[in-house]
């Protein structure tokens, strides 16, 4: 049987199954996660990333405690114009 190399992804998602041998000693076997476990892991990570993005975006706009539609539109247009001035040179 071919042994696969562990990666950070497999190490973080693999679950340890403990099996008892006939002599009473315990051995650990790393099992592959099922699809539900992978989806749970993915959704947990993505929700953490989303929360971080929301926090960062509000920290970038500290003056907007109660933004109006006009102020948001003005700010967005300024950002769009500055982006277009830079062009695709970056």
From Swiss-Prot:
Ranges where the record places region Disordered: 1-31
The UniProt entry's GO biological process terms, in alphabetical order, are: symbiont-mediated perturbation of host apoptosis; symbiont-mediated suppression of host cytoplasmic pattern recognition receptor signaling pathway via inhibition of MAVS activity
Report if keyword Cytoplasm is assigned. no
The answer to whether the entry has keyword Membrane is yes
Keywords, A to Z, come to: Apoptosis, Host cytoplasm, Host membrane, Host mitochondrion, Host mitochondrion inner membrane, Host nucleus, Host-virus interaction, Inhibition of host innate immune response by virus, Inhibition of host MAVS by virus, Inhibition of host RLR pathway by virus, Membrane, Modulation of host cell apoptosis by virus, Viral immunoevasion
Tell me the segments the record calls region Mitochondrial targeting sequence.
65-87
Q: Where is this site: Low pathogenicity?
A: 66
The miscellaneous comment for this protein is: Is not encoded in all strains, and seems to be dispensable for replication.
Q: How does it assemble?
A: Oligomer. Interacts with human SLC25A6/ANT3 and VDAC1. Interacts with host MAVS.
The UniProt function text for this chain reads: Plays an important role in promoting lung pathology in both primary viral infection and secondary bacterial infection. Promotes alteration of mitochondrial morphology, dissipation of mitochondrial membrane potential, and cell death. Alternatively, inhibits the production of interferon in the infected cell at the level of host mitochondrial antiviral signaling MAVS. Its level of expression differs greatly depending on which cell type is infected, in a manner that is independent of the levels of expression of other viral proteins. Monocytic cells are more affected than epithelial cells.
In Swiss-Prot or TrEMBL terms, this protein is called Protein PB1-F2
The major lineage groups are:
Viruses, Riboviria, Orthornavirae, Negarnaviricota, Polyploviricotina
């Amino acid at each position: 049987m071919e042994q696969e190399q562990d990666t950070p992804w497999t190490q973080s998602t693999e679950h340890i199954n403990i099996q008892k041998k006939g002599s009473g000693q315990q051995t650990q076997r790393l099992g592959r996660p099922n699809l539900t476990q992978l989806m749970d892991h993915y959704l947990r990570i993505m929700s953490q990333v989303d929360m971080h993005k929301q926090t960062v975006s509000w920290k970038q706009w500290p003056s907007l405690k109660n933004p109006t539609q006009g102020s948001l539109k003005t700010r967005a247009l300024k950002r769009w114009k500055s982006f277009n001035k830079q062009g695709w040179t970056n």
